[in-house]
Amino acid sequence: MPTRFSKHRKSRGDVCAGYGRVGKHRKHPGGRGNAGGLTHHRINFDKYHPGYFGKLGMRHFHLLRNQYHCPTVSLEKIWTLVPESVRKSLAAKNDGTAPVVDVTQKGFFKVLGHGILPTQPIIVKARYFSKVAEKKIKAVGGACILVA
């Protein structure tokens, strides 16, 4: 073994200082990986990984998650999702430009048709639209875009 690769050049007597001759440096004295986490490596695990071992609480075996989770937003609340600065600038221009509102980014999936929309057009992106909501948005010159 070239000495320039060893951790210390001077091997002092040279019997297995290069760790050769069948396992003289021994293999894995502390065990591999997370071995000994409850015994000889316990201090490390308790300090840096508290709660790694053991159980806590009870599992809910037959938990049924809501498969039809679909948070909704009404048309009357749609303009509150547009930033106020954008609202004012659009009202001042009045040239027909429409803001794009992605309700999925705000945590809603479906747009419902309750309420009255201003006459200003608006582009709404959502996963679902009710028929009334779609009709009202298109009536003011807006657009409904379906998002996956």
Curated annotation (Swiss-Prot):
One of its GO terms (biological process) is translation. Keywords: Ribonucleoprotein, Ribosomal protein. It holds the Pfam family Ribosomal_L27A. Residues 18-38 are annotated as: Disordered. Gene3D superfamilies: 3.100.10.10. It comes from the Eukaryota. GO terms for molecular function: structural constituent of ribosome. The keyword Ribosomal protein applies. GO terms for cellular component: cytosolic large ribosomal subunit; extracellular matrix; ribosome. HAMAP family: Ribosomal_uL15. Belongs to the universal ribosomal protein uL15 family. This is Large ribosomal subunit protein uL15. It comes from Dictyostelium discoideum. The lineage of its organism: Eukaryota, Amoebozoa, Evosea, Eumycetozoa, Dictyostelia.
